[in-house]
């Protein structure tokens, strides 16, 4: 375990799954989970970390099932994008209530609701200590919020994409189904592909690999895990170009 008192990263892109925001509710947003995440983000801001956030929309809407039932995929994806805006509004409000300056930017114009995404302005806001929430994915159908997280992370020149999930890292198998599944502390991009490990969709993962963007998978439901990741402590699974031996 590292005893480094200084943060390992200075600018991050935090990807939160929409499903994890449900907490025990089963649907929608659990206010307790939302407020806890806002407090954890506040801790990072107080450490001087520049934080960009992308939130999924699976707690409110999933277009895949409706697409299989006959709905046009583009329509379903547009609905999914709007679900991420709803989550973004909730997170911005939670941050404001925690006395954290935050700005919500959408990849699709929503005048009067949030700002349009602007790369240069986003970086300026991050440098000034504001949290920037990126909503509506990439603005294009057929692109996941994982792709949006990697894209925004690359654009804002983040040092790492932190992917918050419901498990505490990457395992050799599904730990929920296989108690013998082994957790990896660190992997290379090539090992992920060779072992066919599920981290994120291939388009998002390839984008991160091609731009040498590290990905760190951790359990967003574990209190204090986010801070531990930032401080370089043993938490989650780090994926990067080459393992350090």
From Swiss-Prot:
It catalyses: UMP + ATP = UDP + ADP. UMP binds at residues 57, 77, 138-145. Belongs to the UMP kinase family. It is an enzyme of class 2 (transferase). GO terms for molecular function: ATP binding; UMP kinase activity. It comes from Shewanella putrefaciens (strain CN-32 / ATCC BAA-453). It comes from the Bacteria. Its EC number is 2.7.4.22. Keywords: Allosteric enzyme, ATP-binding, Cytoplasm, Kinase, Nucleotide-binding, Pyrimidine biosynthesis, Transferase. GO terms for biological process: 'de novo' CTP biosynthetic process; UDP biosynthetic process. ATP binds at residues 15-18, 58, 62, 165, 171, 174. Homohexamer. GO terms for cellular component: cytosol. Signal peptide: none annotated. Its main location: cytoplasm. This is Uridylate kinase. Pathway: Pyrimidine metabolism; CTP biosynthesis via de novo pathway; UDP from UMP (UMPK route): step 1/1. It is found in: Cytoplasm.
């Amino acid at each position: 375990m590292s005893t480094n008192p200084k943060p390992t990263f200075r600018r991050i892109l935090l990807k939160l799954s929409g499903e994890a925001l449900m907490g025990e509710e089963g649907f929608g947003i659990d206010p307790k989970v939302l407020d806890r995440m806002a407090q954890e983000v506040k801790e990072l801001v107080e450490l001087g970390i520049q934080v960009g956030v992308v939130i999924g929309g699976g707690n409110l809407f999933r277009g895949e099932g409706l697409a299989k039932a006959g709905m046009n995929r583009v329509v379903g994806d547009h609905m999914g994008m709007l679900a991420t805006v709803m989550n973004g509004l909730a997170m911005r409000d939670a941050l404001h209530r925690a006395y954290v300056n935050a700005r919500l930017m959408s990849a699709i114009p929503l005048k009067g609701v949030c700002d349009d995404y602007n790369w240069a302005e986003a970086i300026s806001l991050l440098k000034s200590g504001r949290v920037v929430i990126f909503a509506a994915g990439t603005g294009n159908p057929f692109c996941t919020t994982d792709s949006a997280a990697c894209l925004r992370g690359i654009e804002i020149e983040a040092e790492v994409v932190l992917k918050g999930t419901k498990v505490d890292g990457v395992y050799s198998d599904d730990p929920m189904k296989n108690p013998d599944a082994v957790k990896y502390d660190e992997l290379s991009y090539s090992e992920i592909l060779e072992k066919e490990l599920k981290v994120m969709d291939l388009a998002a993962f390839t984008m991160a690999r091609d731009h040498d963007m590290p990905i760190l998978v951790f359990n967003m439901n574990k209190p204090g895990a986010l801070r531990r990741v930032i401080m370089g402590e043993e938490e989650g699974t780090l994926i990067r170009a080459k393992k350090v031996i």
